Amino acid sequence: SGRKEKKLWTECDAGEKIVVYQAESERDEARYIADEIQSLVASKKDRLGDVAVLYRTNAQSRILEEVLLNRGISYKIVGGVRFYERKEIKDVLAYLRFIYNPDDSSSLSRIINVPRRGIGELTMNKVEATAASMGVSLFKAIKAEVESEDSLLSSRAKKVLGDFLHTAEELIELKKDMSVTKLAEQVMLGTGYIAELEAENTIEAAGRIENLKE
């Protein structure tokens, strides 16, 4: 290649020497980091607040966060958001909660218009009123409104809700034969979630896609 040879040096030769650890996997790497942190704290050489872990992309934090949480090591993400608190991750988790429990109205409310489906606030207010009057979940209320000939919803609203209902029922059926991982992939692709992010064509959207692939 055309890369120039480099010789790295420092004027400050005090302190610990750099240690290179070649991990077998991402999880092995995260465990090594956690082991080193616990060793430093146990030896009273450092406090947790003295330790920093640098990584190249936000998506790389997931496995490290999991290991730190499992070890009971408290941490703070600087200049970013914890993996499971990122919008795209919360969206997919809400989809999965809804798929495994269609009567989870809270999760349904989060994903009903994600990606954008053109389901407006007025439409959802009517669906919520139906759910309250019938004493049922939002999903059952949507089904009732779509199938009712006396629905107060506009034909357009019934159409977009019907499309959502079709997608939701397909995903609910798929859960019988799919692992959670495969189902999550189907959610991202089948609902158009990834396609919407790709259409944004921004650095932020690319980062979100990378997080989802993680």
Language-model segments: residues:
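Short, surface-exposed, polar/charged, turn-prone segments marking secondary-structure boundaries
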Residues: K7-E11, G80-F83, D103-S106
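Conserved helicase C-terminal RecA-like lobe
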Residues: R47, S61-I73, R86, L93-E214
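Pocket-edge positions in alpha/beta enzyme catalytic cores
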Residues: T10, Y21-S25, V81-Y84, R156, ...
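Structured beta->alpha junctions
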Residues: Q22, T57, V81, P115-R116
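Conserved RecA-like helicase motor-core motifs
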Residues: G72-R82
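Helicase P-loop NTPase motor core
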Residues: S1-S74, R97-N101, S133, K158
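Proline- and acidic/polar-enriched loop/turn elements at helix boundaries
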Residues: W9, A52-V53, G79-G80, K143, ...
